[in-house]
């Protein structure tokens, strides 16, 4: 009786702004000259591959929490087949600030993540810098059915921005999971000036969710990404008002991080994971992943801060200026 309820699978979901994951090749249609070997960041093949493996290390460490996993994640080595079989690596990762398909192919097929067998989908946005969003997933826990990029029509004064990424697929419970990946416009020009630009994207997110629910009223939907806004900001409140809960609203780390991003000594929650009402019973936890090797001492303001890749023009051989969010879901098999 109710035998299926006895078998529960842990589904680990990660949201990560990986900070300027560019390749070293010039795209004549994009403003990516800073991230070339002769650009202001001196973005060489060595630094590119170092960055890829840093992103891989971060993702590995977001999986099953034990000392052995974190020890491996600190090392620049590939993941063995045995490790893949015995460790619970993240099932799904949403990524912000990746340049293109080539970068995602290198990350999943040639970096230290290659034996994890992740698959991915990525957008090709009109963003002037050429940065996109991507969804990376394990084919063993998510079977992709459909994916598409959703273009945002700019309003007056708004530069072309990142596409939304919509994907759907089957999870271990047999349900269809719908995912919307977003990277909303920055606060360049000031919060008030740029607020309407983020509102436009939030409206599009709500429209996508409404179209999904028109077909399946109790659809399981996750919205994740860098909103460049807080839980109390208009864009996040708009999405929550359309039937979502910000499960990352109170997420903190275990090693001093109070949010995913730190600016002038203040921790700020710009990254969010929002879950549809129908999926809330599946939520087990949500945390900021602040493994010690992802942090450095904040010498100016005290405490710790993310170990970013660049500080101004100086390469710091770090990871990202954002920390990942990790949400865990308990799914009936």
Can you name each region flagged by the protein language model?
Residues 24-28, 105-109, 132, 146-149, ...:
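Short, solvent-exposed loop/turn and secondary-structure capping segments
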Residues 159, 207-221, 228-333:
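Metal-dependent phosphoester-hydrolase catalytic domains
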Residues 19, 99, 185, 227-230, ...:
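Catalytic metal-binding/acid-base residues of hydrolase active sites
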Residues 92-184:
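Structured beta-strand-rich core segments of catalytic domains in phosphoester-bond hydrolases
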Residues 8-113, 117-133, 202-203, 297, ...:
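N-terminal, active-site-proximal structural segment of metallo-dependent hydrolase catalytic domains
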Residues 29-32, 172-175, 180-196:
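Active-site His/acidic residue clusters
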Residues 17, 183, 225-226, 322:
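Active-site glycine-centered loops adjacent to acidic/histidine catalytic or metal-binding residues
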Residues 100-102, 128-130, 187-189, 228-234, ...:
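Active-site environment of divalent metal-dependent phosphoester hydrolases
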